[in-house]
């Protein structure tokens, strides 16, 4: 049960292999995808190498895997849900998904995971509500010999078995860099309202730091930074409050829920031509918004792939096979120029996908 690079082969040819990777995700029996590998693991500042991730063909037995999400309130987590559920089916393992109902429900997430473990889970995949708040629980679960995989959001625990996630600092940076290039230093100052997400979540703190770093030294002025849960009502209220306090903002940039809520609000107020919208991650709503010209751009972190990899990591560890300890899909910006050629299978759940809480 040791981490290894043997399951990966070096990727060359960037965009070509990205397209090939997406195509192979559709295959019924197997898939592969361009990823980045951090080594030493669990440090986002570690050097990265580009690889092509190939999962197991099948599990040796129907392992019972528990998956815990912060919530299932938006299409971002639906995509991760599709990734973990479909990969569990492909590998032939059991999967039980629990969701805590929102980023304010840390204690509920902890108790749900504890119940999963008490119910016989052999591995746990966690999309964490808090960067540090689950560390004691992770330590307790690991002490029982149960692997814990950190997916999407990030945790600071050193006891983790593996990570399947990207740098949200880089996601925030890419969004900030995109707009900063349009308004370089020396040009007319432009006000931006920034909505990074729920306070205290690891991905939010990283995303905020990356965004602020990217716009520093440009003509971008961050007029307001508003934190809040990624429920639509919460984000809509934050946008309304910000527009009242700063009617001269030219960009609304933030979570996918922020961007989707802003589209309707700006249209209703006749402000669509005056204020541009960006998200710093990717959902079906953002995808549609970019296609229709209502959202300017967003980086994609290939959410479905992160879910698939997490399940594959769990099975590899349970079976004592070589596994990759810290891996995440390569990031790409999607805008009006390439949205038409973008294959959604790596980032979005299929049309008509319903939340899947159990795979037997």
Across the structure, where does each feature detected by a protein language model lie?
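An alpha-beta-alpha
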Residues: 65, 69, 84, 173-220, ...
């Amino acid at each position: 049960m040791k981490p290894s690079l043997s399951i990966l082969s070096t990727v060359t040819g960037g965009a070509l292999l990205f397209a090939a990777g997406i195509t192979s995700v559709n295959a019924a029996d197997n898939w592969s995808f361009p990823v980045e590998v951090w080594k030493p693991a669990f440090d986002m500042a570690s050097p990265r190498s580009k690889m092509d991730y190939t999962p197991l063909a099948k599990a040796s037995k129907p392992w019972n895997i528990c998956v815990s999400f912060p919530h299932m309130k938006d299409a971002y987590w639906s995509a991760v849900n599709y990734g973990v559920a479909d990969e569990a089916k492909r590998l032939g393992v059991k999967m039980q998904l629990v969701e805590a109902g929102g980023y304010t429900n840390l204690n509920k997430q902890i108790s749900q995971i504890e119940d999963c473990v008490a119910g016989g889970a052999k591995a746990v995949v966690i999309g964490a509500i808090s960067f540090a708040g689950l560390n004691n629980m992770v330590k307790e679960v690991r002490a029982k010999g149960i692997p814990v995989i950190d997916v999407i959001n990030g945790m600071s625990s050193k006891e983790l078995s593996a990570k399947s996630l990207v740098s949200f600092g880089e996601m925030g940076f890419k969004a900030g860099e995109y707009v900063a290039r349009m308004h370089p230093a020396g040009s007319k100052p432009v006000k931006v309202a920034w909505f990074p997400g729920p306070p205290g979540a690891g991905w939010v703190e990283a995303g905020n730091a990356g965004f602020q770093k990217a716009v520093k030294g440009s003509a971008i002025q961050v007029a307001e930074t508003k934190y809040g849960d990624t429920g639509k009502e919460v984000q809509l209220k934050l946008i309304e409050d910000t527009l009242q306090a700063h009617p001269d903002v030219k960009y609304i940039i933030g979570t996918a829920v922020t961007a989707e809520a802003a589209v309707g609000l700006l249209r209703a107020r006749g402000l669509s031509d005056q204020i541009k919208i960006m998200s710093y991650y990717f959902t079906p709503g953002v995808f549609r918004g970019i296609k229709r010209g209502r959202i300017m751009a967003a980086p994609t972190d290939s959410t479905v792939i992160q879910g698939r990899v997490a399940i594959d990591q769990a099975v590899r560890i349970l079976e004592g096979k070589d596994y990759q300890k810290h891996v995440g899909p390569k990031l790409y910006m999607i805008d009006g120029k390439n949205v038409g050629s973008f294959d959604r299978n790596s980032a979005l759940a299929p049309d008509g996908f319903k939340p899947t809480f159990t795979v037997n």
